């Protein structure tokens, strides 16, 4: 079994060694320009077109949970990968736990009003504030995939009212499920904290705009953990300035790194991190990939395959 590996920043030698330990019958090599030798599987992130074009692969693994970048390249270069070759994404590989940590810590930060107390501290003001109640702090999750399910599960322990919005109905214990555009308003109008975990598709680009934000309760919060292109940043800033939104926590942006001139840097009610909410953890990723390749070789059912038409 031949496996080729390409990632512009990962330590290729470490990955090659670890993969060969996990798959003793495989030969793994780092792909380099000019390598046209046969391969059965490809592990990639931002691959050049020529790496995959014309290859008779059994499967391709994207080294991340998001596959919008590779799908965009496939749409621009259909010759890059035959439609019959399955594409897999990393289903969890430790990302679920990271998303849980991030989401829970931020919801609690807002619930306990730590943002307000930091503002008071900056003014040297000693002023206890009224507490929020859990009943008035409903959390709504847009996107009910693997990571959305993990975040909902972690928030249940804290007693917040929970709801999710997705393409298909979910039956998660203790979570109200809303489906499609026709139920979006009902989902939004009782959501105090909006967590975005949507996939990046043509239907979701720019979805967090003034029309959507106006449907949230006054004083709501937005936590974006998905993709920067989901948010119309000017609309978000306008909602913060008007008081419609009380705060926003952003891990992703329409342009990364975020330009120095962006007003998001200086807005007092915007907090941010540099796209680190959930990163690929090599050991967990290799465990998933090696297990899935073994199942594919045996003809067993697998999970994590990307639906190219849907975009995730």
UniProtKB/Swiss-Prot annotation:
The active site is at 227, 275 (proton donor). Its main location: cytoplasm. Gene3D superfamilies: NAD(P)-binding Rossmann-like Domain. One of its GO terms (molecular function) is glyoxylate reductase (NADPH) activity. The keyword NAD applies. Keywords: Cytoplasm, NAD, NADP, Oxidoreductase. Its EC number is 1.1.1.79, 1.1.1.81. It is found in: Cytoplasm. One of its GO terms (cellular component) is cytoplasm. It is an enzyme of class 1 (oxidoreductase). It catalyses: glycolate + NADP(+) = glyoxylate + NADPH + H(+); (R)-glycerate + NAD(+) = 3-hydroxypyruvate + NADH + H(+); (R)-glycerate + NADP(+) = 3-hydroxypyruvate + NADPH + H(+). PANTHER family: 2-HACID_DH_C DOMAIN-CONTAINING PROTEIN, D-ISOMER SPECIFIC 2-HYDROXYACID DEHYDROGENASE NAD-BINDING DOMAIN-CONTAINING PROTEIN. Belongs to the D-isomer specific 2-hydroxyacid dehydrogenase family. GhrA subfamily. Catalyzes the NADPH-dependent reduction of glyoxylate and hydroxypyruvate into glycolate and glycerate, respectively. This is Glyoxylate/hydroxypyruvate reductase A. The gene is ghrA.
């Amino acid at each position: 079994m031949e496996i080729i590996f390409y990632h512009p920043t990962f330590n290729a030698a470490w990955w090659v060694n670890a993969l060969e330990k996990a798959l003793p019958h495989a030969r793994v090599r780092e792909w380099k320009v000019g390598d046209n030798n046969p391969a059965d599987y490809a592990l990639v992130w931002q691959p050049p077109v020529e790496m995959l074009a014309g290859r008779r692969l059994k499967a391709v693994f994207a080294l991340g949970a998001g596959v919008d970048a590779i799908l965009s390249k496939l749409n621009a270069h259909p010759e890059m990968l035959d439609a019959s070759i399955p594409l897999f994404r990393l289903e969890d590989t430790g990302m679920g736990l990271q998303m849980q940590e991030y989401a829970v810590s931020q919801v609690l930060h807002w619930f306990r009003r730590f943002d307000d107390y930091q503002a008071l501290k900056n003014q040297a003001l000693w002023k206890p504030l009224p507490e929020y109640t859990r009943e008035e702090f409903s959390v709504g999750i847009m996107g009910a995939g693997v990571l959305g399910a993990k975040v909902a599960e972690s928030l249940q322990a804290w007693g917040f009212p929970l709801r999710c919005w997705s393409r298909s109905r979910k039956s998660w214990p203790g979570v109200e499920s809303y489906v499609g555009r026709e139920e979006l308003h009902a989902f939004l109008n009782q959501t105090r904290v909006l967590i975005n975990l949507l996939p990046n598709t043509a239907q979701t680009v720019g979805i967090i705009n003034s029309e959507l934000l106006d449907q949230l309760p006054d004083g709501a919060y937005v936590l974006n953990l998905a993709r920067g292109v989901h948010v119309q940043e000017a609309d978000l800033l306008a909602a913060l300035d008007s008081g419609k939104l009380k705060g926003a926590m952003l891990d992703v942006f329409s342009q990364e790194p975020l330009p120095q001139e962006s007003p998001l840097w200086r807005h007092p009610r915007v907090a941010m991190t540099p796209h680190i909410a959930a990163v690929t953890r090599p050991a967990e990723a290799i465990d998933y990939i090696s297990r899935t390749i073994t199942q594919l070789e045996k003809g067993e059912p697998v999970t994590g395959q990307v639906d190219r038409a849907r975009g995730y």
